[in-house]
Amino acid sequence: MAKAPKTVYQCSECGGTTLKWQGKCPHCGEWNTLQESLAAPEPKNTRFQSWAADSAHVQALSEVTAIEIPRQPTGIGELDRVLGGGLVNGAVILLGGDPGIGKSTLLLQTIAMMAADRKVLYVSGEESAQQVALRAQRLGLQSDGVDLLAEIRIEAIQTALKQHEPAVVVIDSIQTMYSDQITSAPGSVSQVRECAAQLTRMAKQMGIAMILVGHVTKDGAIAGPRVLEHMVDTVLYFEGDQHSNYRMIRAIKNRFGAANELGVFAMTEHGLKGVSNPSAIFLASYRDDVPGSCVLVTQEGSRPLLVEIQALVDDAHGFTPKRLTVGLEQNRLAMLLAVLNRHAGIACFDQDVFLNAVGGVKINEPAADLAIILAMLSSFRNRPLPEKMVAFGEIGLSGEVRPVARGQERLKEAEKLGFKRAIVPYANLPRNRKDFPGLQIDGVSSLQEAVEICRNGDG
């Protein structure tokens, strides 16, 4: 008599299992994530293999011949920038983003452009073949060389890959796929993990450049087990406000290029178009005669970007002042307010403080500290900062202004866009001022020096 399947409880966040239901997952600590499921029967012959290409024997690293892997340009400059120059044969890319942000549109455009000189396959698990064809027609794409497969069963997809041997494959999306070897429903942790492992293994063995579309949770993280991001070569996040025409792709992980690289796109009626000069867009409505505004030169991968930081400091009307940020770290705001109080003598304990990075950009680097403080100071005093001025620099707890990486590139970008003055860390001053003839550069080593420059400036 066959044994009845055993009931287990599996965490939807980390994939950990337990025999009894608990309110808190014992593996990752998340609450209310354990879901009842049936334990998979133990197979007689193991089906597990490495998702990397099989190794024949142990060999010394010095004896392995390093071969330069050619890249396949996608034809979309901003996407190639994020990927490090194009797609690599055998690489697996995971693209995540909010629903409706434009993931499927971008990938359909990509493989339509690449179909001119290589075999491509678009696997749709969310739309029918007619829906995909209608979208391609609406975007005005030349889809003659694009092969389409509407399928969610992973074994059928593997058979199609062996028969057609495409060079580029898009799987839209990994959460809709399922394997006959797993009893749980599509989208479960075990299904996502197994399907991704099988597709990754096949991509490595056949040299296929594969792009997996991933859903995101309400917190913005890619849905499914964390191992999904570990097994792929590149993780990209599609960001942007759905009420805005601009979208951004950020490389969180990239084995074949620079991480934190950023690509900017504009959504049009004919699909997504790359933006070669995003700083001009982010500063399109910038006015330097308004209090509470300061331009930051931030660095996204190898690209310097000029972003307007807006601050509003106003009298609080409750017992607890509000501290709200959009596109900036809220914890860092609390730290900067304490530094501003201790080292500049400006107390905001009875003030509401609101910060905004214009254009929907998310800024995480400490180089934004100086621009944030100057914007808050300008709003607090209701006086604009000096005209055509930019700022960048990290601020420490003792009020010192620390240097940041790629200072020369940031200054060149500011001068190119017509700015006349820059407040930077003293250690980031250029060795030769003649390299920046149109830019007055003030180096500061403390927060007090920066405050004095703005106070004595033509504000």
Model-derived features with residue positions:
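Divalent metal-dependent catalytic cores for phosphoryl transfer on phosphate-bearing substrates
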Residues: 129
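Peripheral, non-AAA+ core regions of ATP-driven protein-machinery
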Residues: 2-13, 17-81, 88-94, 101-111, ...
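P-loop (Walker A) phosphate-binding loop of NTP-binding proteins
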Residues: 98, 125
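Conserved RecA-like ASCE P-loop NTPase motor core of nucleic-acid helicases/translocases
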Residues: 120-124
